[in-house]
């Protein structure tokens, strides 16, 4: 509830710390400020409608959302290929389905795909090829390559939305991270049916930002926190108790 919000974050800060940038600890951000991040949403028109529907509506529930994603693989992948092929620059292309990865690999001539069925050696070889610039475009899934990799040579990311803000955050941060010298563009490709997925992803992003901001605020003022109700008076009880 609203009246307990501040005490809650004060309690969290008694056992947790949050740091996003040097200024969160009172230092200067000058040498840490990242280039601008440009996030673009591209709404793709589906070529077919769900059974029994006269026009496109946002999918309701996970079942309908999965069906929407599988039904629009061709249209969404074509949009990503158009965005990536038009630049001639390195691009990091994220997908979630095997069908998406295979379609993208066919549509982007100079791309390499890292899939779950690849051997560890093959994965390493292809990831290194992209990192070293021998492959212009890398296609993979967040659960495979969204953690622990540095691709600062690339400043173009495409993403199919999901309900996981963590996946989106980590996927973007492979390129938009310390050491990146150019503005980073993220093209989010979706359909009318996935409006609900996008809204949920945006809500989680806003909540995550609010959480970090509040944690940093309370963390920095923690030294001034005092207990408001400190019951130090001994209770008076009858002598016969």
Mark where each language-model region is.
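A short beta-strand element within the Helicase C-terminal
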Residues: 149-162, 184-188
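Hydrophobic residues at beta-strand termini and immediately following loops
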Residues: 42-45, 113-116, 189
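A conserved SF2-helicase RecA2
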Residues: 163-241
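Short, solvent-exposed loop/turn segments at secondary-structure junctions
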Residues: 47-49, 97-101, 119, 144-145, ...
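Short, well-ordered beta-strand core segments
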Residues: 138, 156-158, 175
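Alpha-helical elements of the RecA-like P-loop NTPase motor core of helicases
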Residues: 78, 102, 124, 149, ...
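Interdomain linker/hinge connecting the two RecA-like lobes of the SF2 helicase core
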Residues: 1-91, 95-107, 204-228, 237-240
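Conserved helicase ATPase core of P-loop NTP-dependent helicases/translocases
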Residues: 92-94, 101-105, 109-145
């Amino acid at each position: 509830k609203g009246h307990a919000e501040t005490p809650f974050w004060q309690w969290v800060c008694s056992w947790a710390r949050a740091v996003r940038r040097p200024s969160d600890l009172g230092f200067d951000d000058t040498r840490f400020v990242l280039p601008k991040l440009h996030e673009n949403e591209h709404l793709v028109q589906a070529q077919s409608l769900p059974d029994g529907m006269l026009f496109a509506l946002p999918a309701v529930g996970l079942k309908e959302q999965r069906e929407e994603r599988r039904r629009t693989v061709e249209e969404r992948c074509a949009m990503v290929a158009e965005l990536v092929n038009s630049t001639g620059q390195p691009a990091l292309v994220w997908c979630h389905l095997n069908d998406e990865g295979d379609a993208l690999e066919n549509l982007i001539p100079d791309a390499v795909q890292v899939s779950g069925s690849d051997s560890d050696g093959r994965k390493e070889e292809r990831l290194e090829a992209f990192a070293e610039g021998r492959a212009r475009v890398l296609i993979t899934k967040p659960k495979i390559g969204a953690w622990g990799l540095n691709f600062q040579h690339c400043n173009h990311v495409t993403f199919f939305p999901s309900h996981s803000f963590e996946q989106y955050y980590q996927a973007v941060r492979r390129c938009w991270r310390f050491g990146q010298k150019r503005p980073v563009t993220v093209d989010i490709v979706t359909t009318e049916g996935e409006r609900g997925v996008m809204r949920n992803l945006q809500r989680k992003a806003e909540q995550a930002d609010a959480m970090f901001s509040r944690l940093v605020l309370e963390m920095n003022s923690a030294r001034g926190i005092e207990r408001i109700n400190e019951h130090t008076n001994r209770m008076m009880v009858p002598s016969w108790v």
